[in-house]
């Protein structure tokens, strides 16, 4: 399983990577929206994208739309401002408000990754 972490805050990216390390998943990081879209265009699709909405260069909203248009990846929004883009929050597969409880994030991500894996196997 592969997870793309799209987060401009380096400390938050490291924390998310540490959380995911215990879940036996491959991670890729993008510090901004432009890097995230480049990664989506040049790498195999991630199973899950952890997406901050407030990003430099290309907004999280634009990244969200690009993912939905070109990928079947699950999207979990991780943001400090839940009210910033309610239309995207309602379309996401999950939402976590910073700061979040690590154990709750692990439970949700485990569930989403299992469901995504099952969906992908059903399509084969």
What positions do the PLM features span?
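Conserved acidic carboxylate
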Residues: 7, 79
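Alpha4 helix (beta4-alpha4-beta5 surface) of REC/receiver domains from two-component response regulators
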Residues: 62, 80-97, 103
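Active-site residues of response regulator receiver
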Residues: 52
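Two-component/phosphorelay signaling modules centered on CheY-like receiver
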Residues: 10-28
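C-terminal output helix
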Residues: 100-113, 117
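Short amphipathic alpha-helix used as the core "switch/output" element in two-component signaling
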Residues: 61-72
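Acidic catalytic/metal-coordinating carboxylates
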Residues: 32, 59-62
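Acidic, metal-coordinating helix/loop segments flanking the phosphotransfer/catalytic sites
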Residues: 29-48
């Amino acid at each position: 399983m592969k997870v793309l972490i799209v987060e401009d805050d380096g400390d938050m990216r490291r924390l998310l990577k540490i959380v995911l390390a215990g879940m036996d998943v491959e991670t890729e990081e993008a510090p901004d929206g432009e890097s995230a879209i480049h990664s989506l265009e040049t790498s195999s699709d991630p199973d899950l994208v952890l997406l901050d909405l407030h990003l430099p260069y290309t907004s999280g909203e634009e990244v969200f739309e690009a993912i939905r248009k070109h990928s079947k990846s699950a999207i979990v929004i991780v943001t400090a401002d839940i009210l910033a883009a309610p239309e995207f929050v309602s379309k996401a597969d999950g939402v976590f408000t910073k700061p979040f409880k690590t154990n709750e994030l692990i439970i949700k991500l485990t569930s989403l990754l299992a469901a995504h894996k099952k969906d992908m196997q059903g399509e084969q």
